[in-house]
């Protein structure tokens, strides 16, 4: 269990947040939400991780619930049909496992293994049904996720999602090269790369099956909608950097906004933390303005036709869930075992990962 300290209401038991990471405006103005399907979601994602052999059974038993992967998604995609949320949650859990494999391939310097995985994921993204029984569980699990996600939406959405995720895979490859070669990107390079490695447009795309409607291009690309979507994702990425900075500096990392600020802008660690926090807080205030404009835009779409009413309702649902991302991400960073580095026996090796050379098979 987890999700709001064993509660399925939107009134969580407070988790202690370090003062340096505390954002009172999130705690006060962004109340947490939780999809009512969450208890089953957690159980079924745990089973899926086992069935797809994405984590060893002992690690699923000991760590899966405490990692709070399903809590994160169940606090975001409110209103999604149960089967859509289940597919998103399984895909999200897969994404974290993939991120861990990528990290281990870097730590153990396995470029050949990473290259094979990269090409296989590109292939599975374009033809998932052909990869459902692939020998690498990470490829097969990804294919399973994609078959399910693609089933909810029309071909145009599927093609857009695939295009966005091909770019994410290539961004992970750039991060692999940067980390193995010790290259610290400039601030602007990092910000552009982070939008891809954090998969900004993937999580934004998934708002649409949650709302049960593909948004027309003109709606999705409208400045009011796009700005609200971008700010919600930027907040998540930069807050993650703020929470991760001390451990990533200790681990000789090169991919963190703070590290780029220190290296290329000459900031001290304290100044870098202050600057990331400023950017995080600017995202919050910017979103509050963007949210208002996006909801006004939604209202303007209700033109008296059935189609207009449907699109307006879907945009409102998407914008409401952009708001939910703030609280879900914020509390995830203080509840998930993924960030409790001080409790690990070895700070360089997360206890929930398979540290073997999985990719060398």
Per-range role (PLM):
Residues 1-361:
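Alpha-helical, largely C-terminal catalytic domains
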């Amino acid at each position: 269990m987890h999700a709001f300290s064993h509660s399925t209401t939107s009134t969580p038991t407070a988790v202690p947040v370090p003062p340096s990471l505390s954002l009172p405006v999130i705690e006060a103005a962004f109340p947490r939400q939780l999809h009512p399907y969450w208890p089953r979601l957690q159980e079924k994602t745990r089973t899926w991780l086992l069935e797809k052999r994405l984590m060893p059974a002992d690690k699923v038993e000991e760590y899966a619930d405490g990692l709070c992967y399903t809590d994160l998604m169940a606090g975001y995609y409110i209103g999604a049909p149960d089967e859509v949320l289940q597919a998103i949650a399984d895909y999200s859990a897969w994404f974290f496992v993939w991120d861990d494999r990528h990290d281990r391939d870097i730590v153990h310097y396995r470029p050949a293994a990473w290259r094979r995985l990269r090409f296989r994921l590109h292939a599975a993204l374009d033809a998932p049904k052909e990869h459902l029984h692939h020998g690498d569980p990470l490829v097969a699990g990804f294919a399973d996720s994609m078959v399910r996600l693609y089933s909810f939406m029309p071909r145009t959405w599927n093609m857009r999602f695939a295009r966005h995720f091909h770019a994410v895979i290539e961004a992970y490859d750039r991060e692999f090269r940067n980390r193995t070669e010790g290259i610290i990107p400039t601030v602007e390079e990092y910000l552009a790369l982070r939008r891809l490695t954090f998969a900004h447009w993937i999580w934004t795309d998934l708002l649409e099956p949650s709302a049960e409607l593909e948004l027309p291009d003109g709606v999705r690309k409208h400045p009011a909608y796009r700005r609200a979507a971008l700010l919600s994702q930027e907040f998540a990425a930069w807050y993650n950097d703020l929470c991760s900075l001390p451990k990533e500096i200790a681990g000789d990392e090169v991919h963190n906004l703070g590290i780029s600020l220190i290296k290329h802008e000459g900031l001290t660690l304290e100044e870098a933390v202050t600057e990331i926090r400023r950017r995080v807080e600017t995202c919050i205030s910017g979103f509050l303005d963007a949210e208002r404009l996006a909801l006004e835009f939604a209202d303007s779409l209700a033109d008296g036709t059935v189609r207009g009413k449907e699109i307006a309702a879907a945009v409102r649902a998407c914008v409401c869930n952009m708001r939910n991302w703030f609280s879900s991400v914020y509390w995830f960073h203080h509840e998930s075992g993924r960030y409790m580095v001080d409790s690990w026996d070895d700070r360089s090796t997360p206890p929930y990962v398979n540290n073997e050379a999985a990719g060398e098979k």
